[in-house]
Swiss-Prot record:
GO terms for molecular function: hormone activity. GO terms for biological process: positive regulation of cell population proliferation; positive regulation of receptor signaling pathway via JAK-STAT; response to nutrient levels. This is Prolactin-1. InterPro entries: 4_helix_cytokine-like_core, Somatotropin/Prolactin, Somatotropin_CS. The keyword Nucleotide-binding does not apply. GO terms for cellular component: extracellular space. The keyword Disulfide bond applies.
Length: 199
């Protein structure tokens, strides 16, 4: 169900409805990201010590994101909206390549591949929805173009299996983390902008 048909001039979906859809989508993406990470972790990461190496190794670490609800509440809604947009945009390339490269993992289960495809598609939808929300909240502003470029493709193609699996592990770990943050930020923004912070 598209948020508004592309090119439609008189899209009458309310801001509240746009936020409802964005929150549902972000929740779904986080659910899928968590499931995919857990499945990969159980199948490929056991006994390899990946978790100790994965700390702070995300490609968009340069985007300063609030760590908790209290920090997020200190940020102006326009900045928080742009931050969500930046994080979503920073995932376009990694998700696209994840779909391709995950097929090359030895005995990769179909469930992991399906989730990678689904997350990539839903991330695009959420990005479109966020651009519409920003267009309503800040008319004329399409959000800043500040987002982190990803340069991790070579690490997903390494010949050394351990190194390659760690690159996947790290990417999925970061995806789960970021999808959780986006889910929380959108709930906070919806509360602030739609319910006047009464939630």
């Amino acid at each position: 169900l598209p948020i508004c048909p592309s090119g439609s001039v008189n899209c009458q979906v309310s801001l509240g409805e746009l936020f409802d859809r964005a929150v549902k989508l972000s929740h779904y993406i986080h659910f899928l990201s968590s499931e995919m990470f857990n499945e990969f972790d159980e199948r490929y990461a056991q006994g390899r010590g990946f978790i100790t190496k994965a700390v702070n190794g995300c490609h968009n670490a340069s985007l300063t994101t609030p760590e908790d609800k209290e920090q997020a509440q200190q940020i102006h809604h326009e900045d928080l909206l742009n931050l969500v947009l930046g994080v979503l945009r920073s995932w376009n390339d990694p998700l696209l390549h994840l779909v391709t490269e995950v097929q090359r993992i030895k005995e990769a289960p179909d469930t992991i591949l399906w989730k990678a495809v689904e997350i990539e598609e839903q991330n695009k939808r959420l990005l479109e929805g966020m651009e519409k929300i920003i267009g309503r909240v800040q008319p004329g502003d399409t959000g800043n173009e500040v987002y982190s470029r990803w340069s991790g493709l070579p690490s997903l193609q390494l010949a050394d299996e351990d190194s390659r699996l760690f690159a996947f592990y790290n990417l999925l770990h970061c995806g789960r983390r970021d999808s959780h943050k986006i889910d929380n930020y959108l709930k906070l923004l919806k509360c602030r902008l739609i319910h006047d912070s009464n939630c």
